[in-house]
């Protein structure tokens, strides 16, 4: 399929950078309709080795007020109508998602955030809901009992697909609201989300600039993401059809062509 939009390719500080807007320019693709597989496949084709997701989220904790950034390290995937794997035909793979984000890339994000003096929290659990509707009060309260930190609609199956593509992944979430659980704050609406996003836009852009300058120094050369398919593909070689190997050439040629 086609990715969400044309990928912007540029160079900054002698590094090649790619940007893709998940929802398309002008925000016309619903979370459930984002072709995450096409997005990740396209980035892999371009030689992308690291992905940093920047997205808006609701807060599930009093301490995470609107405007605060969260460097997410865990996810609870509550989505149910999205294609979540590249390995769904003839070739089966089971990648580990115990630690879905790359620690070195998270360290780079933290340094970039600190340089901008942004209020942030290192580590947090992101509940990924299907959407596009916001939570009911009962759902919001349920997620709070799970000790989750934030809630949003976009990081899954994105993080899973990045892992299958052996691309390191990190998530920086910008808190825009208190979802609907907080008795002293209005229930979340689009106007509220956009207002906080606009306020944080400059901070987020500067954070990305800082990140691009220094992220390579934080990357762990032994990060297990980069060769996770070595121990993930379970299908016997003689059962791997050429049709499917061709389909997966961008994602898994490193292991399928051995």
Question: For each predicted feature, which ranges?
Answer:
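Acidic, Ser/Thr-rich low-complexity intrinsically disordered segments
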Residues: 229-258
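Active-site/ligand-binding-proximal alpha/beta "capping" segment
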Residues: 115-149
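His/Asp/Glu-rich mid-to-C-terminal helical/loop segments that flank catalytic regions of hydrolases
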Residues: 180-227
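Zn-dependent metallopeptidase/amidohydrolase metal-coordination segment
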Residues: 153-190
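Non-catalytic positions within long, well-ordered alpha-helices that form the structural scaffold/packing
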Residues: 44-47, 144, 163
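Short acidic/polar active-site loop segments enriched in Thr and Asp
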Residues: 49-50, 149, 168
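Generic non-transmembrane alpha-helical segments
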Residues: 104, 108-119, 206-214
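Metabolite-binding pocket within alpha/beta catalytic cores that recognizes anionic/polar moieties
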Residues: 1-98, 255-258
């Amino acid at each position: 399929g086609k990715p969400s939009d044309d990928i912007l390719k540029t160079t900054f500080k002698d590094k090649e950078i790619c940007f893709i807007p998940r929802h398309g320019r002008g925000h016309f693709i619903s979370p459930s309709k984002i072709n995450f597989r096409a997005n990740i496949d396209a980035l892999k084709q371009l030689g992308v080795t690291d992905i940093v997701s920047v997205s808006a989220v609701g807060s599930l904790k009093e301490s995470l007020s609107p405007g605060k950034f969260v460097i997410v390290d865990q996810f609870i995937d509550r989505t149910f109508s999205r294609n979540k794997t590249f390995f769904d035909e003839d070739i089966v793979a089971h990648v580990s998602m115990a630690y879905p984000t790359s620690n070195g890339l998270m360290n780079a994000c933290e340094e970039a955030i600190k340089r901008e003096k942004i209020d942030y929290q290192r580590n947090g659990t992101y509940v990924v809901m299907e959407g596009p509707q916001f939570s009911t009060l009962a759902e919001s309260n349920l997620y709070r009992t799970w000790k989750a930190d934030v809630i949003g609609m976009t990081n899954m199956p994105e993080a899973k697909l990045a892992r299958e593509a052996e691309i390191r992944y990190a998530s920086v979430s910008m808190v825009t609201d208190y979802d609907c659980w907080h008795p002293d704050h209005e229930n979340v609406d689009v106007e509220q989300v956009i207002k906080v996003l606009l306020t944080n836009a400059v901070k987020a852009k500067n954070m990305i600039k800082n990140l691009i300058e220094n992220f390579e120094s934080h990357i762990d050369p032994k990060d297990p993401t980069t060769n996770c398919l070595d121990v993930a593909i379970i299908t016997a070689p003689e059962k791997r059809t050429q049709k499917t190997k061709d389909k997966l050439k961008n994602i898994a040629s490193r292991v399928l062509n051995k």
